[in-house]
Amino acid sequence: MDIPKDRFYTKTHEWALPEGDTVLVGITDYAQDALGDVVYVELPEVGRVVEKGEAVAVVESVKTASDIYAPVAGEIVEVNLALEKTPELVNQDPYGEGWIFRLKPRDMGDLDELLDAGGYQEVLESEA
């Protein structure tokens, strides 16, 4: 299971990659593998203000649908429109082209409350 060390993670299997004053968000390799083949992604609305832990998007697979939660509070500033036509990018490249949304955090310091790669690995091991 791939867990890049350049980003933060949540116990609900989202990743958060700081880029300047924004954070790119997607789901982990573990999450996409557990979901199976992704067939649809319900993207959040740009401009929406969200709280940490709020359900902001939905990823639907052939097996189930799963809410995607905001890792930190802030404003959605961009969504990955490529997922409307090619939702399988979430499976093919969960840490790259399969990102889901970008948000501008209310406080970048909130990222420090998230897990690093090692902490996320421990979460996966405890769930196994």
From Swiss-Prot:
Q: Where in this chain does the record put each Lipoyl-binding domain? A: 22-104
Needed cofactors: (R)-lipoate
For this protein, the record's Pfam families field holds: GCV_H
* UniProt remark on cofactor binding: Binds 1 lipoyl cofactor covalently.
**Gene Ontology CC terms:** cytoplasm; glycine cleavage complex
Q: Which SUPFAM superfamilies match?
A: Single hybrid motif (SSF51230)
Which GO BP terms sit in this record?
Answer: glycine decarboxylation via glycine cleavage system
Keyword set, alphabetical order? Lipoyl
Entry-annotated residues carrying N6-lipoyllysine: K63
Record bears the keyword Nuclease: no
Q: According to its UniProt entry, what is the function of this protein?
A: The glycine cleavage system catalyzes the degradation of glycine. The H protein shuttles the methylamine group of glycine from the P protein to the T protein.
Quaternary structure?
The glycine cleavage system is composed of four proteins: P, T, L and H. Monomer.
Homology family: Belongs to the GcvH family.
**What name does UniProt use for this protein?**
Glycine cleavage system H protein
- Gene assigned in the entry: gcvH
